[in-house]
């Protein structure tokens, strides 16, 4: 007899997100354990297809201004992915996470060394529209086109309806 789960996929995702958030909020959770919980679908050295595409869109915008491509850092992308997943699971859209604080707080918490850092976040129906919105906003555009940063982390989370949460963390 074939087992068919009676719980819809959306409910499973919500239960998984709630379980991950509960584990992350426990006092015993270490930064590495937190990252591992959100990294279930990827190794720390890999990017999803959407994250690769988002990185290509960002570097394409830089190329239009004759700027060098930023190096897409896997560890920084892991942190950016955690931020996107946190916004999706937590139902918020802000540069300040109720769980992790600011981008600098997150980098410190996860032990990522940096001398300069900034963050872009976008929520849209497609990656292309998210990047277009970022490049159209003066503050976000400044980050995308900055010569201060040499590395970027890209994190993407997708809602059941197909909307994307994109986090770009820029560092030097």
Q: PLM features: residue spans?
A:
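A well-ordered secondary-structure block
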Residues: 2-6, 102-172
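Sec/Tat signal peptide C-region and signal peptidase I cleavage site
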Residues: 29-35
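Short, well-ordered surface patches within globular domains
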Residues: 46-105, 152
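Short, contiguous pre-domain boundary segments
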Residues: 36-44, 63-64
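Bacterial N-terminal signal peptides
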Residues: 17-27
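Generic early N-terminus positional signal peaking at residue ~5-7
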Residues: 6-7, 19, 35, 41
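Bacterial N-terminal signal peptides that target proteins for export
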Residues: 4-16
């Amino acid at each position: 007899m074939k087992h068919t789960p009676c719980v819809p996929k959306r409910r499973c995702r919500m239960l998984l997100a709630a379980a991950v958030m509960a584990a992350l909020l426990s006092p015993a959770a270490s930064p590495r354990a937190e990252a591992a919980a959100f990294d279930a679908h990827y190794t720390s050295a890999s990017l999803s297809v959407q994250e690769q595409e988002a990185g290509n869109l960002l570097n394409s915008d830089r190329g239009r201004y004759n700027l060098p491509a930023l190096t897409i850092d896997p560890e920084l992308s892991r942190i950016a992915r955690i931020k996107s997943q946190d916004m999706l699971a937590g139902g918020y859209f802000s540069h300040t996470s109720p769980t992790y604080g600011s981008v600098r707080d997150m980098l410190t918490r996860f032990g990522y060394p940096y001398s300069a850092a900034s963050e872009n976040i976008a929520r849209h129906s497609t990656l292309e529209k998210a990047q277009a919105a970022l490049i159209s906003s003066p503050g976000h555009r400044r980050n995308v086109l900055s010569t201060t940063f040499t590395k970027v982390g890209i994190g993407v989370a997708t809602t059941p309806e197909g909307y994307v949460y994109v986090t770009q963390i820029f560092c030097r």
